[in-house]
């Protein structure tokens, strides 16, 4: 588990303070390699690359979590319309939000801050923090 003092300023802002990175700025937005997306704080698996798609919204988007336990869902009323916040199911780090405008087969769009994830390349094992 990553300690607060070992996190970047942006990781603290997003993961611990429910912030949002600017759209189209995240390191993992255009990641096309095969692999696993993990929580940057506790390294729990969140998404597989096969479920990633280009939603055009500026943040990495996925249509399905790796397992039902991987994600925790919370009602979010901080903006003018209700949303569903998503957090890591293991450490409770803020990840982003989920919307019901995604592609088949789920119809869901998990809109995730790059900085809240680390990508593990399935070929090399390299871990790249967003």
Curated annotation (Swiss-Prot):
Q: Which GO terms describe its molecular function?
A: peptide-methionine (R)-S-oxide reductase activity; zinc ion binding
Which Gene3D superfamilies would you find in this protein's record?
Peptide methionine sulfoxide reductase (2.170.150.20)
Q: What is its EC number?
A: 1.8.4.12
Q: Name its GO BP terms in alphabetical order.
A: protein repair; response to oxidative stress
* Active-site residues (renumbered): 111 (nucleophile)
Annotated cofactor note: Binds 1 zinc ion per subunit. The zinc ion is important for the structural integrity of the protein.
For this record, an example GO cellular component is: cytoplasm
Q: Does the keyword Lipid biosynthesis apply?
A: no
Protein origin, superkingdom = Bacteria
The keyword Oxidoreductase is assigned to this record: yes
Q: What InterPro entries is this protein classified in?
A: Met_Sox_Rdtase_MsrB (IPR028427), Met_Sox_Rdtase_MsrB_dom (IPR002579), Mss4-like_sf (IPR011057)
Residues that hold Zn(2+) according to the record = 39, 42, 88, 91
Q: Give the family, as the similarity comment puts it.
A: Belongs to the MsrB Met sulfoxide reductase family.
Protein name listed in UniProt: Peptide methionine sulfoxide reductase MsrB
Q: Which species is this record about? A: Pasteurella multocida (strain Pm70)
